């Protein structure tokens, strides 16, 4: 397992997890994901982020193709979530860095995760605008709180024109390609939307505050902690896409979700879809039983109307439908309009039951 040189003296040393199908335990990643970590070879050899629990061996193996792990001088932690720092103890034990840089909030998270294990770690908290020289390269830190954790920050290297963006601009893509331009373009866009609408969406106000800062930087490459690295034209494309997704402007498309017992509600769902079609509105029908709730949320990335259907079951609705609605509500899409429908044998409460769970 070799390191991949993405720029002169800058390497990808992460790992690909082809078997990670439930991202964060709630969003499907059917082809797996990547845990990206990066290494800069300089007077102060610097590792940026680590990998998930159980994956330290892969990182250290790749790193070992460039230098010995104990030659790492600095470690930068952009984000303390365990899919990036769950291997921190093993990496620090192997590398023994002289300094570890992270945000103040990350330092608090680190203490919560590792307690007495970190009492001898040389951790230094940094804030927005702080910079360090590692030789030919300078690293500038920018806090991005609630994008998507309180401890989040990004690291910018002006000499290499690269932004190490942690979870921002990421996707769940597992494969041997490292760059966006090596991957099928339509799939990249779909995966970026899937990631944003299932992970980042509630923090869209923070995205809109952060994007002007990102646009002010001279960037030729964005290196996220998941998925593919953007370079050249794809840098502007992913920044523009994030702005569009964060703005959540109304889109002329509807998504109809439903569950059914004896196909009556299913027939109604298709009838509703036909009504949209007859009026020139693109629409998609999705069974809550057949589609994971993260797939439904991804479909809503291009829609601003949600219609929900369920038969009445025990004076309420079928559980798959309510599960999907609860998930959507937690992600707080801001422009959804729509309605509810249902079928029944003798009571018919289901449409009214949706009102308390409607994702407004």
What residue ranges belong to the model's regions?
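Conserved beta-strand hairpin/beta-sheet module of binuclear metal-dependent hydrolase folds
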Residues: 3-65, 154-157, 161-165, 265
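Metallo-beta-lactamase
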Residues: 5-8, 102-224, 229-233
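Active-site metal-binding motif and surrounding structural segment of the metallo-beta-lactamase
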Residues: 43, 54-101
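Active-site neighborhood of phospho(di)ester-bond hydrolases with catalytic His/Asp-centered motifs
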Residues: 48-50, 72-80, 100-103, 163-166, ...
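A short, aliphatic-rich alpha-helical micro-motif
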Residues: 69, 157, 297-301
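Short helix-loop-beta junction
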Residues: 270-284, 302, 359-360
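Helix-loop-strand module that forms the ligand-binding subsite of alpha/beta enzymes
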Residues: 292-360
């Amino acid at each position: 397992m070799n390191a991949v040189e993405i720029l002169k003296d800058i390497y990808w040393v992460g790992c690909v997890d082809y078997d990670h199908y439930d991202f964060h335990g709630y969003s499907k990643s059917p082809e797996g994901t990547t845990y990206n970590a990066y290494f800069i070879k300089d007077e102060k050899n610097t590792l940026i982020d680590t990998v998930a629990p159980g994956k330290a061996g892969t990182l250290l193996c790749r790193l070992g193709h460039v230098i010995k792990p104990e030659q790492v001088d600095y470690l930068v932690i952009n984000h303390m979530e365990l899919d990036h720092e769950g291997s921190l103890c093993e990496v620090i034990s192997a590398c023994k860095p002289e300094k570890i840089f992270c945000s103040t909030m990350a330092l608090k998270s680190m203490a919560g995760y590792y307690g007495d294990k970190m009492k001898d770690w040389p951790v230094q908290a940094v804030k927005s605008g702080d910079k360090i020289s590692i030789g030919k390269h300078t690293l500038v830190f920018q806090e991005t709180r609630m994008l998507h954790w309180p401890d989040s920050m990004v690291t910018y290297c002006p000499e290499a024109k690269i932004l190490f963006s942690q979870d921002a601009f990421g996707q769940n893509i597992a494969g041997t390609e490292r760059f966006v331009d090596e991957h099928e373009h339509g799939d990249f866009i779909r995966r970026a939307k899937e990631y944003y609408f299932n992970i980042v969406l509630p923090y869209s106000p923070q995205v809109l505050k952060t994007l002007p800062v990102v646009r002010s930087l001279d960037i030729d490459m964005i290196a996220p902690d998941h998925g593919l690295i953007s370079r050249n034209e794809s840098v502007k494309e992913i920044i523009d896409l994030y702005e569009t997704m964060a703005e959540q402007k109304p889109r002329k498309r509807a998504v109809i979700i439903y569950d059914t017992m004896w196909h009556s509600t299913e027939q109604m769902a298709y009838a509703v879809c036909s009504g949209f079609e007859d009026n020139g509105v693109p629409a998609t029908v999705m069974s809550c039983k057949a589609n994971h709730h993260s797939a439904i949320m991804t479909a809503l990335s291009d829609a601003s109307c949600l219609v929900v259907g369920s038969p009445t079951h025990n004076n309420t609705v079928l559980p798959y439908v309510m599960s999907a609605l609860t998930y959507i509500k937690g992600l707080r899409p801001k422009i959804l309009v729509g309605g509810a429908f249902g079928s029944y044998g003798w009571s018919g409460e289901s449409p009214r039951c949706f009102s308390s769970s409607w994702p407004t």
